[in-house]
């Protein structure tokens, strides 16, 4: 395994030919009013890690270029495709019009949620994560095809938005690989 130091991580700059060789997965990561810029940057890193098609920033979510997003993303904002929409419902409506058979999955604690490891995942998929305090908006939960949640056994009943997304993203990759 290769271990890179902080300086090396922050100075990685892939060549255009290198980027074209990467097979993108039909995964769209939607941020529904995620406020913490470090979460936004870390989500760009997750998008890069799974070769997601696009990160979609909505509402009050800050957009690149932003110093803290860039730092947390270790420059992945430079090559991970992203788009901004004023509201999340408009983003989802746009994606549904342009991508056939798109599955919208909200990651949220809800009485309608199924455990993330029991959900039915297929490509193309859009994963929606929400505001750090308020979660995914009710409007988005109503139009999601599925709501998934991560079981919690301790005293604390919530995880950081980026951590939750990472867990579900890798479950999506695992599940989709076998279809």
Where are the regions that the model predicts?
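Post-transcriptional modification and biogenesis factors for structured RNAs
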Residues: 1-179
């Amino acid at each position: 395994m290769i271990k890179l130091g902080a300086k090396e991580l922050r100075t990685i700059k892939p060549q255009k030919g290198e980027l074209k060789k990467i097979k993108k997965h039909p995964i769209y990561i939607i941020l529904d009013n995620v406020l913490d810029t470090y979460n936004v940057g870390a989500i760009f890193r997750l998008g890069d890690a799974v070769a997601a098609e696009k990160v979609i920033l909505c509402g009050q979510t800050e957009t690149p270029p932003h110093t803290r997003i860039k730092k947390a993303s270790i420059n992945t904002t430079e090559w991970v495709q992203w788009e901004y929409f004023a509201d999340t419902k408009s983003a989802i409506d746009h994606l549904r019009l342009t991508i056939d058979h798109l599955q919208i999955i909200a990651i949220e604690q809800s009485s309608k949620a199924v455990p993330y490891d029991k959900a039915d995942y297929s490509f193309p998929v859009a994963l929606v994560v929400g505001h750090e305090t308020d979660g995914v908006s009710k409007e988005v939960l109503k139009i999601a095809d599925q709501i998934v949640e991560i079981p919690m056994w301790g005293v604390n009943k919530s995880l950081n938005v980026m951590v939750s997304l990472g867990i579900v993203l890798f479950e999506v990759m695992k599940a989709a690989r076998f279809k």
